[in-house]
Amino acid sequence: MTKLIQWLTVLLVLQLGLVVGLNLTQTGLSAPTSQMRLISIGNIEIDQLTITNAQGEQVNLLKKEGSWIIPIDGDFPADHEKVENFLQRLLELQRGLPIGTTPAALHRFMVEENNFERRIALQSNEKLIAEIFLGTSSRARMANARSSQDTSVFEIKLATYEVPVKSEEWQDERVVQIPYFDIDAIDVPGVISLVRSRSADTGTSTNSDATPATELWSSVELGPGESIQQDGADTLAKSISVLRVTDVLGKDMKTIYELTPPQLTLVVKTINDATVVYELGAIEGEDDYVLKASTRPEYFLVPSHLATSLVRATDRDVIVLKQE
């Protein structure tokens, strides 16, 4: 009996040793999260992104005083949220299993220093921190990728079309917008002047699709039997609040801009006592429109559907109701 107990004790010790050994082995095989990422930059703050395509086209995004700008567009504001989300996505890219490790594989997958679909350079204080080469993948929404510090190729969840090199793709398209609840008054010269009633609008809701309160908009320019169509007036305010641009046309007035006089002029007063003047006109030979806002030195391209919608919203018959 004593020998049996001794053998069982030895067997138990061996089993415990085996369990501990397996746990240690598995722990050793589980790489830290940072080692599973395509790139790792630690706590370094990236303040510059440069994206280049196979044809040599390039866009540079620079973080200045906490905001992203586009130097090639005269330091025009970039879409801060879009840039930050893109940067975070780059830092979270996982390596997975390599799909190639030889020089021939790097060439075939187009992730070489001079052979790529996209090159993304991340810098801090003008120092290169990380560099990623992207090549095409046969799978949708995927790309072959390699860090400049690695000789292996990995397939990642980021398509090359999600990494544009056109500056307009990174511009803040909302730069001329005025938040809906910040609009205090709207003047359409020669048509109507509207004033917002703050007593009818508590301003507690941020939903610009909400039904306007009774008598939210008023005007002193109404004739006998006329009243404000609240839905129509509110549609105009909402059209201003969602106004977006698709490109920066520069700071110089051109003869093809039909702004002398403009097709539409809007004067908007805000809750902060600021005045913003919008001038909208057609562009000779094009479907889209040109917009000039007094808050910016640039001229902007506005999509045709947004421009025509804004023009229709300023029609007096849409805003003013006449009693028969």
Residue spans for each PLM region:
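Secondary-structure "cap/kink" motif recognition
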Residues: M1-E324
